[in-house]
Amino acid sequence: MLPNEELVPVKRITPQSSWSWISIDATGKKTVLDVDKYVIMHRVQIHARDLRILDPNLFYPSAILGRERAIVLNLEHIKAIITAKEVLIQDSSDENLIPTLEEFQTRLSVGNKAHGGQLDGDVVEEDESAFEFRALEVALEAICSFLAARTIELEKSAYPALDELTLKLTSRNLLRVCKLKSSMTRLTAQVQKIKDELEQLLEDDEDMAELYLSRKLAGASSPAIDSGEHINWYPTSPTIGAKISRAKSHLVRSATVRGDDKNDVEEVEMLLEAHFYANRQNFEQINRATRVCG
């Protein structure tokens, strides 16, 4: 360095501290929030390590984490925090998020008496489900549908490409097949991560019990709950914590469950299995197509 040379300060790249969020409550009302991460942490009562897995600038595998007052979802383009009263979705420019936001607004409204927004008056189970479970159901249906559609899209492209390569072996046709196989390999990994999350949750009743946010809120006034046990709701690892599924449970029942019923997860388990099997079928389908590509 020359003696008279001035030192030029180097701008450090720091983690993003303020994100844009979309809040959707039980009435379907949407609100855009541009707030500091500490505001979000205080609002939903989660640790910094939990919020970190939603950082769009960092890579974290798919995760579904149950916490004391919230459920943290990192499902590809769907990055959300669900509480018993609202869902906070990280705003992004990903066009795949648009239909998911619309579905959240439609399905989370307490006035929506039928599944999927149909107001025929015959199906009222959605109104009786806890808010957090309706939100979880929307998120998991959205990601599973997205991955299934992507699988079909690649599968439809793969077979014609293989036929072209069989008829005429050219570098162009070979490159096309290689690109398709690469895309299928990435998709397989994405599908498997979701499948693994659901499977791990199914294997642990305590993890599934963590998902009843409304149940825990209802029991918060109990001396047994207020005695300091709430610390245990924060698992040590952000990736091993409670996993969540597409879940529905009657709100009235959840609000009146006693402490000795806290591990009653039969309804959650049945709903979780439905998503697990659907996702496993998708996993097998994309695997078959990948093997065909060689």
Swiss-Prot record:
Domain of life: Eukaryota
A Pfam family the protein falls into: MRS2-like
UniProt entry keywords in alphabetical sequence: Coiled coil
InterPro entries: MRS2-like (IPR039204)
Protein known as: Putative inactive magnesium transporter MRS2-8
Coiled-coil ranges from the UniProt annotation: 179-216
Name of the gene this protein is made from: MRS2-8
Annotated disulfide bonds: none
Keyword Coiled coil: yes
Taxonomic lineage of the native organism: Eukaryota, Viridiplantae, Streptophyta, Embryophyta, Tracheophyta
The keyword RNA-binding is annotated on this UniProt entry: no
GO terms assigned for molecular function: magnesium ion transmembrane transporter activity
UniProt family annotation: Belongs to the CorA metal ion transporter (MIT) (TC 1.A.35.5) family.
